[in-house]
Amino acid sequence: MDTEKIPRRFEFARDSFAFANELVWEYLPDAVTGKTMMVARDPKPEYAHRCFALVRVARQFFYHARFAADQPEASGEACRRLMRAVMARSVRIRCQPHERIVIPGFPGLREFSRTHEKLIKAECGGAWRSYFLRSHWRMIFPFSRAHQTRTAEALITALGRNHLPILHLVKFPALSINHAIILFGVTDTRQGWEFESYDPNNSVASERLMFDRGTRAFILPANACWPGGQLDVSHICRSCFF
């Protein structure tokens, strides 16, 4: 029986995957032009284009699973059934504590995915899950500064309710970024807000996303797949339209 009375907060070291979504391209700065060059990775990655799939499943585990490290670990086939049961749940609505699916033998998703990496990668699905999403229609329309301000405010409200907002990061019509992350914390700063995020491309540490109240824009610092700078944010997996 789940005796959870106070909803626990997302913890990167416990609630993220032990493996990363691999990058197809390596992003390198050009010393002459200052621009970022894209160089194909060699050897070709075996597990890429799964960012949307990974953030979706990470949230499903946070919303619908309870890990029980004090119980005997389930067999591989039993773990597969548990994995599928979690993935069959809503990605948008959290279940009641007593309805959570118990995952025995592990303290959290990180250790579960470390032990059953191959199984979990297979069950999360192929790269197509990152391309065929109902929310992708939004990226072709302009993102106004007022819209981005409202989005930032809505994200703060969601985090205050212990939700895990999933964001689609875009720079449309440029194709320089098409990525998904999860937010799990926010800090008020002099310039605006600094959000703490789980980026499925990074299994080592959490990352940051800033919102500048002056420019009314989101700013993502440079990382393995982005040279740094302003981009647009769409809050997805939150309604029947997203």
Which residues make up each language-model segment?
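Residue-identity detector for threonine
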Residues: 3, 33-36, 115, 149-151, ...
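Cysteine-nucleophile protease catalytic domains, especially the papain-like/related folds used
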Residues: 6-145
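Short alpha-helical interface elements
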Residues: 79-87, 180, 208, 222
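Cys-His-centered catalytic/binding microenvironment captured across papain-like cysteine peptidases
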Residues: 1, 174-178, 187-242
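Weak global preference for isoleucine
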Residues: 6, 93, 101-103, 120, ...
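Residue-identity detector for glycine
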Residues: 34, 76, 105-108, 125-126, ...
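Active-site-adjacent substructure of cysteine-protease-like catalytic cores
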Residues: 143-190
